[in-house]
Amino acid sequence: LKAYYFQSSRGLPKATTLYNDFSAQHLWDKNAFIQSQYKKEFSRQWVFRTSAKWNWSYQHYLDPAIKNNEGKTENSYYQQEYYLSASVLYRLLNNLSFSLSTDGSINTMNANMADFAHPTRYSWLTAIAGKYVNEWFTLSVSALATVINEQADKGGSAGNHRKLTPYVSATFKPFRNEEFRVRFFYKDIFRLP
């Protein structure tokens, strides 16, 4: 079990305009998380691993010199994440293994602004992979299934996404006594903002 807490308070620089470099902007950050991991080797062939994490972050921004109706800009943001992960590894032979992993997370974000969307994102990622290794050659293949469901209390959300992305990698060691390798790979990536 691991726990972490971080807190900071700092001024932010502003653009220098006509030799005026004064800035009253300020940013406060707080971040805390708790995580745990568990690993169990049932045999030389079977290995199970799981982890869990809770993360909380807070950010407060203040610019007292802004020219608006309130005479300042002041925003607070809160974010939480709940994350679970599990994987199983199966070694069929000494140089051939397969794995199945899955990650799930829930992310929420809130702010003190009147028209803030208050988004919530549910993410589920599952990968199946295989790996072959010998002294001259390594081959890795995998497929990642990504399922994202997003909702917002106000306005539009980024929507729901489903994607299957492949990965293939081949590594060759052409010389026995030299640590020189040639690697080829193909990867299709999918990311959300």
Role assignments for model-derived ranges:
Residues 3-4, 93-193:
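Structural signature of Gram-negative outer-membrane beta-barrels, strongest in the C-terminal barrel
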Residues 25-27, 39-41, 75-77, 89, ...:
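Residues embedded in well-ordered secondary-structure elements
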Residues 2-49, 54-80:
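Flexible loop and strand-edge segments within Gram-negative outer membrane beta-barrel domains
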Residues 76-102:
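Outer membrane beta-barrel translocator domains of Type V secretion systems
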Residues 17, 21-23, 31, 35-37, ...:
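Generic structural signal for short, flexible, solvent-exposed coil/loop and linker residues
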Residues 31-37, 51-53, 81-89, 123-129, ...:
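Membrane-embedded beta-strand positions in outer-membrane beta-barrel channels/transporters
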